Amino acid sequence: MIFKNNYLHWFIQRRLRKNNITAGGHSQYGQDVTVFNLLNKPSHGVFLDIGANDGVTFSNSLYFEEKGWTGICVEPHPTIFESLSKSRQCHLLNACIAATDSVVNFLSVEGPANMLSGIVQYLDKSDLNRIDKEIAAHGGHKHEIQIEALSPETLLQRFNITEIDYLSIDTEGCELSILKVFDFKKTPVKIIGVENGSRSPELFRYLSQQGFYLKKCVGCDEIYMRA
């Protein structure tokens, strides 16, 4: 069964990655415009952007805010969050998302490679090598800090969110772990955009089990809709 699912994911993403770049919007590859069109261009909605960066550069949610949507941008990196707080009008949270409310070790990368920062637990050897190479080539430094982590339940209760139209996750390696702590039955989600640079079939397998199907592949992101 695992082999069958792996092949199915490979076949679908290979087909969907053809001509997958959409112009317009703020996302790196047009993910925002793609999602907006898939949802039939609604004039209002709710987004949750986990790993929002500075809220502008390659943002997956700014386009929706400009369209009149409301939502939450979550960014754990303290320095980047300062920029986020100056650029966006939606709810903002300087924290990580985890299974329980806690404190986690976070590798904070300062400089041009700051978008590669992440929770230490989920950064593998290749991630760390990439960070070191970027720092060596372009400058900057890295250090570990402790930051707040909230469960999705706590996050959504804090901002009184009962349903999500668009969930975007770009967290440098811990996307699947975040998805696994969401209760999709308690908080319905219409569409999910999740980074899968390694093209791992694990995301496909898990979200299929949760009732989502792979609709589009846009750049490094896979876009899933509720079946």
What are these regions (language model features)?
Residues M1-A227:
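Phosphate/nucleotide-binding beta-alpha loop and adjacent structural elements of enzyme active sites
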